[in-house]
Amino acid sequence: MKTGSEFHVGIVGLGSMGMGAALSCVRAGLSTWGADLNSNACATLKEAGACGVSDNAATFAEKLDALLVLVVNATQVKQVLFGEKGVAQHLKPGTAVMVSSTIASADAQEIATALAGFGLEMLDAPVSGGAVKAANGEMTVMASGSDIAFERLAPVLEAVAGKVYRIGSEPGLGSTVKIIHQLLAGVHIAAGAEAMALAARAGIPLDVMYDVVTNAAGNSWMFENRMRHVVDGDYTPHSAVDIFVKDLGLVADTAKALHFPLPLASTALNMFTSASNAGYGKEDDSAVIKIFSGITLPGAKS
């Protein structure tokens, strides 16, 4: 198996997670290629040592041993792979495709079947950990797929992941685990926002409330990470409100298919949907706190 600079990997989607993954591949010594519609992101990756960048991965597809797709949703994944300028038709048979977007299990299965038609192996491999862990090559990967897919993607997984969980051999299982994880993530953010909103209404300084919770049993990773943005009055999007409208929608769809009630997740989805409807969809997901009326939130620090 190829290793180091002999191994060519392309990353499609150079947002916070995709850029982190791409930079991790560069640091690991892999010959790294990147594609994104954002020319600034492409320039950043090229300056960091990528072999090449483009707004379309098809331009370098034939060079690749593996492709990592980390875009927003299933529609974008399908467009990248099978659209008018889709990359799948340009990849060498046997190339491994790691789909790391948060998508429905059924979409993962459909994409895997379509890729197989091109002689390509797919690893259903959604990721978590946030931008910092992505940048440090320490993402958590929830993966399902064939032994061949895992083997062919080993250099990429070693470069980008701190932990790799092998969920099973069938595409779709990894996506299901990620969707369940997103249930918890969304509920934690919504609950944190509700708690901080109540503190604001009660006249408790939010920096004090934050300090207490992060040093007590009620803390969670999402509270500590996202409610810091509220305290700082900084809603620059690291993960936007609309992402959780999408992800909690996938949670709801999964539960509906299984005839399973999810009262907390349903409430969280309603909260994020309300925030999006109020015009906060492109802000950081912590902006869900803005749906509460009658409170004063901290402003951005100069």
UniProtKB/Swiss-Prot annotation:
The active site is at K178. Gene3D superfamilies: N-(1-d-carboxylethyl)-l-norvaline Dehydrogenase, domain 2 (1.10.1040.10), NAD(P)-binding Rossmann-like Domain (3.40.50.720). It comes from the Bacteria. It catalyses: L-threonate + NAD(+) = 2-dehydro-L-erythronate + NADH + H(+). Its EC number is 1.1.1.411. GO terms for molecular function: NAD binding; NADP binding; oxidoreductase activity, acting on the CH-OH group of donors, NAD or NADP as acceptor. NAD(+) binds at residues 7-35, 102, 246. The keyword Transcription regulation does not apply. InterPro entries: 3-OH-isobutyrate_DH-rel_CS, 6-PGluconate_DH-like_C_sf, 6PGD_dom2, 6PGDH_NADP-bd, HIBADH-like_NADP-bd, HIBADH-related, LtnD, NAD(P)-bd_dom_sf. GO terms for biological process: organic acid catabolic process. It is an enzyme of class 1 (oxidoreductase). Keywords: Carbohydrate metabolism, NAD, NADP, Oxidoreductase. It holds the Pfam family NAD_binding_2. The keyword Ribonucleoprotein does not apply. Catalyzes oxidation of L-threonate to 2-oxo-tetronate. Can use either NAD(+) or NADP(+) as cosubstrate, with a preference for NAD(+). Belongs to the HIBADH-related family. L-threonate dehydrogenase subfamily. This is L-threonate dehydrogenase. It comes from Escherichia coli O6:H1 (strain CFT073 / ATCC 700928 / UPEC). The lineage of its organism: Bacteria, Pseudomonadati, Pseudomonadota, Gammaproteobacteria, Enterobacterales. The gene is ltnD.
